[in-house]
């Protein structure tokens, strides 16, 4: 693996920073070569760095402690002021569709991949987001701001706590350097971790530029590293497409089940590993609105909550188009897409491979919601029960998280007085309509074999008490702006175990206050 000297003109950025037991660094994506990336150093911060947030859960596989990172040498490496000997910083090139329109070449415009570390859990890429200009920055300045970095840090770890596949966030480091957005904001760098940051857009880039050897090399890299079972298939690239479709479907079902809205599901923000990637204008549902748009920049509602399953399929279709040259009858040869006799079989095969998304999503969606309702068996009337529930929640804008959390308290043999006293009714303004659905739900529970207590316990393991509501993130951001990082840490710790009770932090579980309705998040991070 090339050392950091390969990207420096002098030794001014060299750092001895290391920690005992650091996993071995080895070439991963970097082995693909210069057609896929550009090696360059980070741009040093013009102000002193300070630690804003640290995730011990994300750091555990790396063997890195907060005390080990929070040193002058450690802060310098993870803010981009210095390059450790185990690091080989680089930015990758990709393209993509943004809001349904081909955007051409994109790439890591403010992110640098520092290294791939071989942990006991497998490969772990370490990436700085906000590390300065790269050849792919386009009109950007290469920086990230404290506001968006805290949001990404907290949500990455919150999603991990929920058991949803995601990139992780090791730390956030701030620096009192001005960054111009809609206003002047404070600079920050978030360190992200993932087995790989390869996106759908990486494949689109080489397909669009007709660089077919590079397209094959990228697909082979992903298969050999992350989908080795595909190599044994007669059509390994079609097998890859199917497996990515399966993982993506499972991921989106998990998003929908917890009320997570990504906000900007462009193809360049879709992980080839089925991870939640790029936390920008995201949000969790407060009052349930199937058409909720969390991204203020999404004026057409393309990425609204209810649209996410279809958008994920659309993005997979773009990935399939990119892989078509590899999907012909002979996987060792490139398919000539200008020749209908070659192209049509590849198209048909890719379309068939994508069917796995529809089937997997449907199965995963209903399995998730049966679990949320405490139902262990599938019944013919369940879809109608679910549909009536979604209509009820949507019509009354009932708090999504609180409803499912309180639903565990319902008992199948509640007396009328007990039914009237259940807290779950409090999330509705029209309680008569809620009572009608709850009566149907109690009737459905009569067919379940599990006792009420066991069912309630199981429901509390899948229905979180805590999610990262926008107003909670906003409070943490405002306090961090005053150099009080305690709210970032408290929120991180609670969200790492969102299904548990946390005495002293019950206010994190409450509904959004009225002032939160004015909060807006957009792509301007």
Curated annotation (Swiss-Prot):
Keywords: ATP-binding, Magnesium, Manganese, Metal-binding, Nucleotide-binding, Nucleotidyltransferase, Transferase. The active site is at 268 (proton acceptor). Mg(2+) binds at residues 269, 278. The keyword ATP-binding applies. Its cofactor is Mg(2+); Mn(2+). It comes from the Bacteria. Its EC number is 2.7.7.-, 2.7.7.108. It catalyses: L-seryl-[protein] + ATP = 3-O-(5'-adenylyl)-L-seryl-[protein] + diphosphate; L-threonyl-[protein] + ATP = 3-O-(5'-adenylyl)-L-threonyl-[protein] + diphosphate; L-tyrosyl-[protein] + ATP = O-(5'-adenylyl)-L-tyrosyl-[protein] + diphosphate; L-histidyl-[protein] + UTP = N(tele)-(5'-uridylyl)-L-histidyl-[protein] + diphosphate. GO terms for molecular function: AMPylase activity; ATP binding; magnesium ion binding. The keyword NAD does not apply. ATP binds at residues 107, 109-110, 129, 141-142, 192, 199, 278. Nucleotidyltransferase involved in the post-translational modification of proteins. It can catalyze the addition of adenosine monophosphate (AMP) or uridine monophosphate (UMP) to a protein, resulting in modifications known as AMPylation and UMPylation. Belongs to the SELO family. This is Protein nucleotidyltransferase YdiU. It comes from Ralstonia nicotianae (strain ATCC BAA-1114 / GMI1000). The gene is ydiU.
